[in-house]
Regions:
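Sec-dependent N-terminal signal peptides of Gram-positive bacterial secreted proteins and lipoproteins
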Residues: 1-22
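Hydrophobic alpha-helical segments, principally membrane-spanning helices and signal/leader peptides
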Residues: 1-2, 36, 41, 100
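Primarily secretory-pathway and cell-envelope proteins
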Residues: 18-85, 123-139
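Generic low-complexity, intrinsically disordered sequence content enriched
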Residues: 5-11, 26, 44, 117
Length: 139
């Protein structure tokens, strides 16, 4: 019985430590641009996936790719997560006034999440600097 308790405590310690290892340094990403909305599709998220609507409210084509990241709200600030992901690099364009549903699945990279998070994407308009958009959710 004593060995079983030690094993259980060890496993719990390892699992707790793994979650903390995912939390990285404080994020320096600034979210901006009123001409773009990035919102959660109602009832679309679980602890392993979510869908967000990317809406271009400008009069220019909005460009974006497949890369994305997740940040966690921890101890009063947004923090990066220590997870590396690989992406194909196609470039997509979203016409003015259009919207697109983007689906995200992090089960194999981040596991099952619990807490407050945001999905981060970088986007840009032609001949302009890239900027970041965020879709927040809590599980």
């Amino acid at each position: 019985m004593k060995k079983l308790i030690v094993l259980f405590v060890s496993v719990m310690f390892i699992l707790t430590g793994c979650k903390n290892d995912l939390i990285g340094e404080k994020s320096n990403i600034k979210i901006g641009d009123n001409d773009v909305e990035f919102t959660l599709v109602k009832d679309s998220f679980t602890n392993t996936k979510a869908s967000c609507i990317l809406k271009n409210k400008s009069d220019k084509i909005l460009y974006y790719g497949t890369p994305w990241d997740i940040e966690i709200y921890d101890d009063g600030s947004w923090k990066k997560m220590n997870v590396e992901m690989m992406f194909n690099m196609p470039l997509m364009g979203l016409e003015p006034g259009s919207e697109k549903v983007l689906n995200f699945n992090w089960e194999h990279t981040h596991g099952k999440l619990k807490g407050k998070y945001r999905i981060i994407k970088d986007v840009y308009f032609e001949n302009e600097e890239k900027f970041f958009i965020a879709c927040e959710f809590e599980v």
